[in-house]
Amino acid sequence: MAPFTKSVTEVQVESVIFPPEVKPPGSSKTLFLGGAGVRGIEIQGKFIKFTAIGVYLEDNAVPSLAVKWKGKSAQELTESVEFFRDIVTGPMEKFTRVTTILPLTGQQYSEKVSENCVAAWKSLGIYSDAEAKAIEKFIEIFKDQTFPPAASNLFTQSPLGSLTMSFSKDGSIPEVGNAVLENKLLSEAVLESIIGKHGVSPEAKQNLATRLVQLLNENSTTDLNESENEKLNSNEVSKEEKPLQVEKSAFKEVEV
């Protein structure tokens, strides 16, 4: 992992622990935990928790996001649709782990996700035959699956557009996926449905924003240190060529 992600810690959501880093199915990379939270709905005045969700990101997400978002507060990021859109569509690998708190069938889960995806695509006018076929395959892959408490749906999202899907009954992360769908819109939509404008886990969004603020600021500090090192190296070269001028310049910097 990059130096600025070594401070990443685990997150516990209910009884589910999301470790600080994982190697997703179908990937050769190790991703860090961006954030995690619960998904639930209010039923008759009571909030019922259905799943715990963890979102992992490739290391290059930090410098990529820092270009636009460093210096922002956690609240600003939490409230920014564009920030989460940059995560969903950014040129980095993403991994999402959805672990059940209450039992679900594969059909229940896939149909709800598909319904949200199709509605979003139609509202944007981007629902085509390719997406319709991808949704059919998505539902078919989940058809015979069952998810008792502690079981997980695992999604590895490649920046090239593929979506690797895996299943785990005991919290472990398999090395290979159960199926791969080559549809960029669907790949992005799965994560979008969780942390997007109408995402199903506001808690995961807030946790993601809060944790990334620290990493973005650390990355900014790293950039500053690298810049200072470049200046020092430059001064060392200049010192050999023009010792008197450099000593004078260095002295002025100390005074300031």
UniProtKB/Swiss-Prot annotation:
Chain sites annotated for binding substrate: T51, N116, S193
Reactions it catalyzes: a chalcone = a flavanone
SUPFAM superfamilies in the record: Chalcone isomerase (SSF54626)
Claim: Glycosyltransferase is one of the keywords in the record: no
Residues under site feature: Important for catalytic activity: Y109
EC number(s) recorded for this UniProt protein: 5.5.1.6
Family: Belongs to the chalcone isomerase family.
Note: Part of the biosynthetic pathway for all classes of flavonoids, a large class of secondary plant metabolites, many of which are brightly colored.
The protein's name: Chalcone--flavanone isomerase
